[in-house]
Amino acid sequence: MTIPFWQEKTLEQMTENEWESLCDGCGKCCLHKLMDEDSDEVYYTNVACSWLNDKTCSCKDYPNRFTSGEECLKLTRDKIDEFHWLPDTCAYRLLSESKPIPEWHPLITGSKSEMHAAGESVRNKVVYEIDVVDWEDHILNHPNR
């Protein structure tokens, strides 16, 4: 039996296609985050980037996402040490922490359907910036709520 590439290679050793395939397409990294100025704690909101399609959990303009004016961050191998802000289910983060990827990950199941069924995507769970008045009302992981 062949060992999956993500189990035998480090993130630095992966090809560009392998690297890109680690993204499960959950859309969580497309949610706006707020940072506590005192503690540097990162809080996820349910406020999505205006380019996120909330049905497919994909960018509406993926090829131009870094030049669209949005705050889309490119995940690169030289920034692995900064991956702590990614969702705790993210393959990039998990592999950078020497942890296994989830059983519902599309690399294991062959499709995104298991991820959506497990409730691990943002499908139909977001609001858009234009509809938000008080961003703090949209914090998902606030410790005091």
Curated annotation (Swiss-Prot):
Belongs to the UPF0260 family. HAMAP family: UPF0260. InterPro entries: Puta_zinc/iron-chelating_dom, UCP006173. This is UPF0260 protein VS_0923. It comes from Vibrio atlanticus (strain LGP32).
